[in-house]
Amino acid sequence: MKLDLFKWEKPAWIVSSLLVLISIFAMAISWAQFQAPFRPGLDFVGGTRLQLQLECASSNNCPAAIDVAEVQDILGGVGLGNSSVQVIEDYTLSIRQQTLDVEQREAVQKALNEGIGKFDPETIQIDTVGPTVGKALFRSGVLALVISLLGIIIYLTIRFQLDYAVFAIIALLYDALITMGAFAIFGLVGGVEVDSLFLVALLTIIGFSVNDTVVIYDRVRETLERHSDWDINHVVDDAVNQTLTRSINTSLTTSLPLVAIFLFGGDSLKFFALALIIGFASGVYSSIFMATTLWAWWRKWRSPKNPPREMVAEV
């Protein structure tokens, strides 16, 4: 497999820029609606979530899917019109409210049974998270992301040089932004909420993406050692093509079980797997088209009249 990297450099950057703009736009709309870049789940905002499933779902003979507007009207009738409502796989209902005591919960279940149909009491799930715990969990997740990025910068600076580290971080931030933008869109269009597993997914994506980038950078360094008289673009193109098959195969084999989890897993695991699929695909793309071309541009700009030389750091 042969890729003419710099032939596709401009189209790749145009696509990347469009995806970044779409992601930022989606997160801006989410911020206006939810005061967060995506629809926050119970883990982050706190409150109580009540999940119920229609009794007919077990025998697969329900006459119609649950209608969100109808549920909102019923909840409004019991004084809970400001609840967040989500329908899962047509026949399962998830209701989130900041406060939902026992009396309110019983009133909701009674109203829903009368207005929509009989819900199976054995499938009822109730989760409660305090607002303080939710905020602390969010802060801990963000702190973990920041620490991981700082650790990557230090590691890559020691193993290679600072400019390698900077452009690798730019590629990682791109992967995180694209994944967050996708879930901002899912939240706006499909009501998908983000929970603590999403932060775990972002950390996993960062680790996967930096691994791809390190492999390519390692080939860049080796090629510079052997061919210090080569043009920088030639060096980068050669390094990318040496690792291209490996990057694609690794991504595909990693994504196959994630696709299975997405198709057959529970709701939380389903969107966790989807985040990883998006992030891993973005990681392969950014390590090939972003981290490398940025580094090549910087090296040519820094010494345009000099033949490329590399001060190789010993690992």
UniProtKB/Swiss-Prot annotation:
Q: Does the keyword Nuclease apply?
A: no
Source organism (scientific name): Synechocystis sp. (strain ATCC 27184 / PCC 6803 / Kazusa)
What topology does the record note for this protein and the membrane? Multi-pass membrane protein
Functional note? Part of the Sec protein translocase complex. Interacts with the SecYEG preprotein conducting channel. SecDF uses the proton motive force (PMF) to complete protein translocation after the ATP-dependent function of SecA. Probably participates in protein translocation into and across both the cytoplasmic and thylakoid membranes in cyanobacterial cells.
- Supply the InterPro entries for this chain: SecD/SecF_arch_bac (IPR022813), SecD/SecF_bac (IPR022645), SecD/SecF_CS (IPR022646), SecD_SecF_C (IPR048634), SecD_SecF_C_bact (IPR055344), SecF_bac (IPR005665)
GO MF terms on file?
protein-transporting ATPase activity
Q: What is this protein called?
A: Protein translocase subunit SecF
Q: Does the keyword Transmembrane apply?
A: yes
**Cellular localization per UniProt:** Cell inner membrane
| One CC-aspect GO term | plasma membrane
**Which residue spans traverse the membrane?**
12-32, 136-156, 166-186, 188-208, 247-267, 271-291
GO BP annotations of the record are:
intracellular protein transmembrane transport; protein targeting; protein transport; protein transport by the Sec complex
Keywords, alphabetical: Cell inner membrane, Cell membrane, Membrane, Protein transport, Translocation, Transmembrane, Transmembrane helix, Transport
Query: Which domain of life does the UniProt lineage start with?
Result: Bacteria
Family of the protein in this entry: Belongs to the SecD/SecF family. SecF subfamily.
